[in-house]
Design a protein with these regions (language model features):
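A SIS-like phosphosugar-recognition module
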Residues: 1-187
C-alpha cells in the first residue's frame, strides 16, 4: 500500500490552487499519483502511459534482491520493469497506427538494492522531502488541508439531513440525490 501512502502525502499536501498569500497559482501543483505493484500496474494503466494522448511522467520503483525464493519470478518482474522504462523512452515505430509507440515518455527508475527497513525509510523520506521542497518552491503550505476540511463540514450537515429529510437551502442536485437516498432506505 505504499502507492496509497504516497497518493495521500502528495495530493493532500500539495493539491492546492493558491499560494500562502491567497494568490491563484498560474501553474499546476500536485501531480496525480496512483500505482500498483508488478504486473497489476502494467495491465491497469501502462497502455495509457505508452500510447495515451497525455504525456505523464512516472516513477518505477524496483528492488534488486528478491524477498522470496520463487525461482525466476523476481527476474521476470525486474525484466518487465526495465522493459517498461525502455519502451517509454524509445517507443517503437510502426506504419500501423495502433502499433506505434511514440516513446520520449519521461520516467524515473528507482532501484533499491534490497527491501529493508532502512531502504524503505529512505524511499519514504525521499518522497516526503520532495513534497516539502515542492510546496516551498510553489509558495504553498503543504501542511494544511482545507479541501479535506470542507468535505467534512458538508458531510456533517448532510448526515443530519439524511436522517431528517430536510432539503431546504440545498442545491437541486444534492437535494435530489438526498431524496433518492432516503427513498432507497440508506438512512
Amino acid at each position: 500500500r505504499l502507492a496509497a501512502h504516497w497518493q495521500q502525502l502528495e495530493m493532500e499536501s500539495n493539491g492546492k490552487r493558491v499560494d500562502q498569500t491567497g494568490r491563484t497559482l498560474p501553474f499546476a501543483t500536485s501531480p496525480v499519483l496512483w500505482g500498483e505493484p508488478g504486473s497489476n500496474g502494467q495491465h491497469a494503466f501502462f497502455q495509457m502511459l505508452h500510447q495515451g494522448t497525455d504525456v505523464l511522467p512516472l516513477e518505477i520503483v524496483a528492488v534488486r534482491q528478491s524477498a522470496h525464493g520463487l525461482p525466476g519470478h523476481h527476474e521476470m518482474l525486474l525484466a518487465n520493469a526495465l522493459a517498461q522504462a525502455q519502451a517509454l523512452m524509445l517507443g517503437r515505430a510502426s506504419d500501423c497506427g495502433h502499433r506505434h509507440f511514440p516513446g520520449n515518455r519521461p520516467s524515473t527508475f528507482l532501484l533499491l538494492d534490497a527491501l529493508t527497513p532502512t531502504s524503505l525509510g529512505a524511499l519514504i523520506a525521499l518522497q516526503e522531502h520532495r513534497v516539502f521542497v515542492s510546496g516551498a518552491l510553489w509558495g504553498i503550505n503543504s501542511f494544511d488541508q482545507w479541501g479535506v476540511e470542507l468535505g467534512k463540514v458538508l458531510a456533517n450537515d448532510l448526515q443530519q439531513r439524511l436522517a431528517s429529510g430536510n432539503v431546504e437551502g440545498l442545491d437541486a442536485s444534492t437535494a435530489g440525490m438526498l431524496c433518492r437516498l432516503r427513498q432507497n432506505g440508506s438512512h
